[in-house]
Amino acid sequence: VSTSSAPARPARPARPALPFEQPRPVEQSQRVRSSPAAQPLDVDVLVVGAGQAGLSAAYHLRRRGFVPLGPDGLPSAGLDDGASPGDRRTFVVLDAAPAPGGAWQFRWPSLTMAQTHAVHDLPGLALDPGDPRESASTAVGRYFGAYEQVNDLRVLRPVSVREVRDDPATGALLVEATTPDGPATWRARTLVNATGTWTKPFWPWYPGRETFAGRQLHTHDFGRAEDFAGRRVVVVGGGASATQFLLQIAPHAASTTWVTRREPVWVGGPFDENRGRDAVALVDERTRAGLAPESVVSVTGLPLTPVYEAGIASGVLRRLPMFSRVVPDGVAWDPGVRPDGVTHQGADVILWATGFRAALDHLGPLGLRGPGGGIVMDGPTVVADPRVQLVGYGPSASTIGANRAGREAVRAVLRVLDGAASRDGAAPYDGARPVVPGPA
């Protein structure tokens, strides 16, 4: 996320709704009733995750005529298109979160819509600009919930996928999950994985980190700035979250210290849709070159808004080089690292705003990772197993990229279902490249 001075975009003109976009009286959170003895529920496409990438994929499945299945494995109530159940291709969307909103619902309450990079429209439904002061977790959660209902996506939640493995007898994928009512299993011909990164916070290792006597927390754990009252806080990370935390914490904390590996790059002007598309293109160019994607801010830079200018002038956003090690009472630099010659900073709290990694542990049994630990991709398709599409990573990690990746993933799904690709017979691709890096 990043602070932006861009004005709110006006709502797009209304357009006629597609047939499947008519509102239906469906539940937003549907329960799966199952038991350890239950037979697998068969489905053509299983979408795991209901953030922007997963919802985009589900939308494009609907456009292609796929029918969403409910928790009982049956098509939507009221569906009457004249086709017999066996003639319809089906999909299911599973989401581990308790409510609509993807990872946005877990963001800290003080993150407002005005402070985020532009949240781009999901396909087929414009986001009402609303109040820029509203919490992003509330606004985006409401938008995603409306999107699920308008498109009758029948998202099943909370469902946590434990494991995806091959079923040699059928050539399908067995997806084992945990629901509030017990275990459940789906047998899917293809899988669109959109589990994101929020559940995999990245904690870099530095010498002595385990010796620190104070509190260590991650962006994932941030709550309120008031929680840091009277504390000496070291914030680690060069992204937008780190700078937002510093500005919020500084009025309450005894002191704040900002450390990064690289000098921050400040960029003037609003972060509009054109800049967003340029950023996606730069990330895509890097992954096409066979390189792991870097952080978002390494591509976009930090927006030099009046709020940030004031933070720089006040000294709150004064960046220091990364410390050399953690000590029980703070952090330490080797002699000569800091320009001012200081070698020690006392701290009560270290806040690691150091990003996230792809949440893909449940795919481990499929053996998708190569010798270096990364997963080689062709667009959203896993080269080692074309039945699996990964969306919401690398170039598709933004709301712009996620929308495009959802569409591309559905095209790839159709190739698999039409027999053009399988685990043992992948369709030709235009040069394999690692998009999802291995575990750190």
Residue ranges and their predicted role:
Residues 99-124:
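Redox-cofactor-proximal catalytic regions of oxidoreductases
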